[in-house]
Each structure stands twice: as C-alpha cells, then as structure tokens.
Amino acid sequence: MDEVEFILEEAKEGMEKAITHLKKQLSNIRAGKASPSMLGSVMVEYYGSQTPLQQVANVNTPDARTLSIQPFEKSLITEIERGIMLANLGFNPMNNGESVIINVPPLTEERRKQLSKQAKAEAEDAKVGVRNDRKQAMQELKKADISEDLLKSSEDEVQELTNTYIERIDKILTVKETEIMTV
C-alpha cells in the first residue's frame, strides 16, 4: 500500500507544480490594470550584476493606470529606466528625479484577444503537464507489485486527481480571461 500512496503523492506534487507554474506565467500577462507583478521580469544593473527590480526599489500602484518605482538609492533611477526599456514590456518610463513613473496604457481590443490567446496557451501547457504526471503515475502503478483490484482503484484515484487539477486550471484561466477582457 505504501508504494501506491507514494506514486499518488508524487503525481499530486507534479500536478501542483503545473498549477504553480501556470499562476506564475499568467501573472506576467498584463491585464487592464497596473500591477507590480508586471515588472517581475525587469533586471537592473546594480554594482556590476543583474539584480531583480524588486530588490533595488519599491514598486507601488498609486492608481489603476500608474506604476510608481521608488529606488532605494537615487543613483539607480537611470539604471531602472534602462532595465524597464530592455525588458521590452511596451512601457515608457518617466523619471521625475525622485522616482520612475510608468503610465500603463489601456489595452486595445486586439491586444486583449492576443493576451487571452496567450493565457489559453499557458493553460493548455499546464494541462499537458498534468496529463504527463497522470501518464507517469499510471505506468508506475502498472509496474508496481499490486493486486488487480488495487491497481484499478488506484488508477481511478489518479484519474480523479487529474480531473480535479484540470478543473482548477480551467477556473484559473476563466478568472484571468475575465481580468484581461474587462475594460
């Protein structure tokens, strides 16, 4: 019985990783309103090494269309601007001497559809990951030295687990699509 529990736990961990990865990927897809996570991929030159923006500055959202970046050291303002430009996020940073301000433009209908398509592709990748974990668990169960009845009930359990995770992925996608399409 221990072997079966181990196989099921391993499958569950793999499926959970697919969900975590999906959430991380979707957080990089820009919806209508400004969010500090939009700048998650921005790297800044800091004392000769590339450092994530969040480690050298505070990122705030004063309103739904604005990002405000306060560097911990004022000397970093130009490096932060450069990092934002190099990240190729489509933002035009403005330097006011104290901080960097980014006005997030509203999304066009066409861009919303592109982002929605991108979100669907990420969700599909996550589903493929979950199905691969199911396939691996099924193969390991077949190799295990267990009775037919236990094999059948364990396979059913793996399928149930798979269905649960696929449903979670669909819910996450629906929320993100709603967020993207809301004007």
Curated annotation (Swiss-Prot):
Keywords: Cytoplasm, Protein biosynthesis. It is found in: Cytoplasm. Its main location: cytoplasm. GO terms for biological process: translational termination. CDD domains: RRF. One of its GO terms (cellular component) is cytoplasm. GO terms for molecular function: ribosomal large subunit binding. Responsible for the release of ribosomes from messenger RNA at the termination of protein biosynthesis. May increase the efficiency of translation by recycling ribosomes from one round of translation to another. Belongs to the RRF family. This is Ribosome-recycling factor.
